[in-house]
Each structure stands twice: as C-alpha cells, then as structure tokens.
Amino acid sequence: MKFVDEAVVKVQAGDGGSGVVSFWREKFITKGGPDGGDGGDGGDVYIQADENLNTLIDYRFQRFYEAERGENGRGGNCTGKRGKDITLRVPVGTRAVDIHTNEIVAEVAEHGKKVMVAKGGWHGLGNTRFKSSVNRAPRQRTLGTKGEIREIRLELLLLADVGMLGLPNAGKSTFIRAVSAAKPKVADYPFTTLIPSLGVVSVVPEKSFVVADIPGLIEGAADGAGLGIRFLKHLERCRVLLHMIDIMPIDQSDPIQNALTIIDELEQYSEKLAGKPRWLVFNKTDLMPEEEANEKIQEILDALGWEDEYFKISAINRNGTKELCYKLADFMENLPREEEEVAEEDKVNFMWDDYHKDAIAGKDVITEEDDDDWDDCDDEDDDGHVVYVRD
C-alpha cells in the first residue's frame, strides 16, 4: 500500500436541533401549560488512533466528513434526539492541525486514544424553559446553533526510538539494512530513499529498538528544498538521533561542510529537534587506510568542536555496527522516555458557549411575533398538542 503521511480534510460537526413552542391541549383542558421540548445537540467529530493502520491514503480520496444534525424538540416535553458522532480512524502517531491557524487541534500517540476535532452545535430551548411566575404561557424558544466546521491537515509522525539523518548517499539506508530486516532501496545516486522506512533492531531478545530512516537532507531543506524537510517531522518523537557522515563522499564534497549543513538545517527546522541527544556516525571508513580515516575523522571533530559520542563504521561491511547497536540499546535503557506533557484538552473556541445562558436572559430568543410561520390557536382547539414550529 502506498505510504501517505499527510492529507487535508474538511470536517463539519452536526447542527443543534431547535426548541419548539407547544402547549398542552386535551379534552376539558383548553389552556394547558407550555410543553415545548428542547432540541438535540449536534454530533461531534473525533479522530481515533488505530494500530492496524499505517497510512493516511484513505483520506486522499474522501475529503469531507459530516456528523449528524440534532433533531428538533417536540410537544409533550419531548427532547430531540442527539446527532450521531463521527469518528475518523487514523494511524497511531497522527496529529490534526488547523490549516488556517496552524494550531494543533488533536494528537493521538497511543492505540485507542480518541480526541474531538469539531464540536457539535448546542440544542435550542423549548418554550417550557421560559415559564415563570409572571409568564405562564411563554411563546419564546431558541434555535439550535451551527456545528463547528474545520479544515484540518492530518499528519502522520512515525514512532521510532532512533532517527537517522544526513546528506543523500551518506549510507543511512545501508546501515538500516545491515542492522535490521528492513530492506530500503540502496543505489549510488542521490535521493534513492523517497519515503521513510522503519527497522526493528534486536540486540538480544529482551532488548530491541526501532530505527527510522528518512530521505537525505540538502542545503536549504528548512526552506523546502529537496525531500528531507517533508519528513523531518518523523524524527520529532525519536529519543536519539544518528547523524551519518560520509568521510569520503562520491561527489568529492567537503565532509566538514556537509556536517555543518545538516546541523544548520536541523536548527532552522526546530530547536526542540536540534536539542535531542545526537551521535555522530562516520561511515565508509573502509574506503581509506585506517590511519588516514582517523586523521580525517579527528579533523571533522575539531572543526565541529564535538565532544560527545561518535562512532566509526562501515555499513556495507557491517564493521562497527554491532557495537553501535549495543551502545544504543544501553543508552535508551538508561534514558527515561520523555514524559508527554499532560495538559488539559484545549477548550474548543466555540461561539455558542454561552448560548443557553443568554437565551434565558432574553437574548437570542425567537418569539412567535418574530416567526412568520406561527399561527395562533383559538381557545376552541382542545384536541391534542398545538405545536408552533419554524421551518
């Protein structure tokens, strides 16, 4: 199945049902009290994480989703039925972003988590709500409100422990093939990797971790150049980054400048991502004598002012890869997972939050005098309910 990690959809919550003006009528009771019921609330729109999904391709074909409208109220103090909610199933790790405000509306990082992205409209109030000691036969009601409409961008962020980054042809895909069962395409031309790939590395049966390989970065990636910027988001949940450096590039470029380019693009993209633990991995050490390779590596370390972890490997020959994987497993075992910020769910900014309070106070109320369709009844009407409904 084609890997799709981004899709734009329009979601519309259901409108609220309107309240009704109604009075009880039966034999010998010609002037019964008000019994108009409230409308039903509109249905909400949710997204829910499903571990059985791994792509957003379904949302490339259907772009509009609408929840059910609430029913109008009825006589006899009957409340309208609430509109049915609608739930969009998405892969674990998906977030929803409002395309107009760029606000993260929802994020689902574990299976079964369900978050609202559009709120249904409030129900309208029937005339029973307006009965008081001075108003025994109220002819007021309120209309249901409109459901919220949002255009959201669904973004899938892969869940991996280790993220790999570097220039094209640095050897990232070769490394992931060497240490896991993943088989990304490998060739001697740039941008062989076009989509992210995941590989599970099992050091010992009880120790394993997931590695994410993304397309290579180039200068200007933070401004949209190349393919890497589109996929950098997949590294946001990684616990450690491996910066792969080719010490003998096939285009004879300067490894020092190449390393600085990656660091610069990383910092421009996200300070949080740039602040994650990052190890330097010098690849293709088999292409030159050991002494010359060590001198080259030391030259790069000095130029970068690097004092943290670094490793020398040859991914194609698997030299040094086993030791690196053991180091990664031990590091992550001792590194506590970042605690997700437990924040209260963002309150949906909805224009009708105070609707009912305003209605009882006399605002936003529909009266029969305002309703072109109302038809007053005479006292001789004594059979059943008399209901006034605005179309």
UniProtKB/Swiss-Prot annotation:
Its main location: cytoplasm. Gene3D superfamilies: GTP1/OBG domain (2.70.210.12), P-loop containing nucleotide triphosphate hydrolases (3.40.50.300). Its cofactor is Mg(2+). Residues 367-391 are annotated as: Disordered. GTP binds at residues 166-173, 191-195, 213-216, 283-286, 314-316. The keyword Cytoplasm applies. It is an enzyme of class 3 (hydrolase). It holds the Pfam family GTP1_OBG. Residues 367-383 have a biased composition (Acidic residues). The keyword Cell wall biogenesis/degradation does not apply. Keywords: Cytoplasm, GTP-binding, Hydrolase, Magnesium, Metal-binding, Nucleotide-binding. One of its GO terms (cellular component) is cytoplasm. Disruption phenotype: Deletion of all but the first 99 amino acids confers multiple defects in several cellular processes, including increased sensitivity to UV irradiation. It is not clear if this is a complete disruption or not, as in C.crescentus and E.coli this gene cannot be disrupted. Residues 1-159 form the Obg domain. Induction: Induced in a dose-dependent manner by UV irradiation (at protein level). Its EC number is 3.6.5.-. GO terms for molecular function: GTP binding; GTPase activity; magnesium ion binding. GO terms for biological process: ribosome biogenesis. It comes from the Bacteria. It is found in: Cytoplasm. Residues 160-333 form the OBG-type G domain. Belongs to the TRAFAC class OBG-HflX-like GTPase superfamily. OBG GTPase family. Monomer. Overexpression protects cells against UV damage. This is GTPase Obg/CgtA. It comes from Vibrio harveyi. The gene is cgtA.
